Amino acid sequence: MTKKNFEQLSDLNAEFFESAKLSLLDPLGLYLANDVKWIKLNQNWNSLKFPVVMGGKGQPILLLHGFDSSFLEFRRIYKSLKRNFQVIIPDLLGFGFSPRCATNEYNSSKIISHLIDLLKTLKITKNLKIIGASMGGSTALKLAYEIPDSIDKI
């Protein structure tokens, strides 16, 4: 596939999400979905756009969902956390609304690489707090091992 094909697929993914979110019945889910930003990553990820919920100000806090889930997992606590933190909730690589053509490999190492590139793109290099649910918890530990100087608390 060409770079243009990847970009077109990425745009279609974002367009699909924007129309699909309107069918969310849970008001907290819709509140969270309205804060999704599509963050374009580097060539390692075919320059695709990835969905990341971002809101609030303050110390950054990264929320990592569990297996077979999405950023919507945190809809019940997002509004509350957003009052005091810069909340960042990505869909983990290969889950939720993340583009499936970003890589042909989906494993814990790729998920960590993806998160590191996302944090670099967002210029988050220190004082990061992480909350991980289920698989997101083990991902948080692996991420802290890889970038210990960036992590404040898990």
Question: Positions of the model-derived regions?
Answer:
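Short, hydrophobic alpha-helix immediately C-terminal to the catalytic nucleophile
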Residues: 75, 116, 141-145
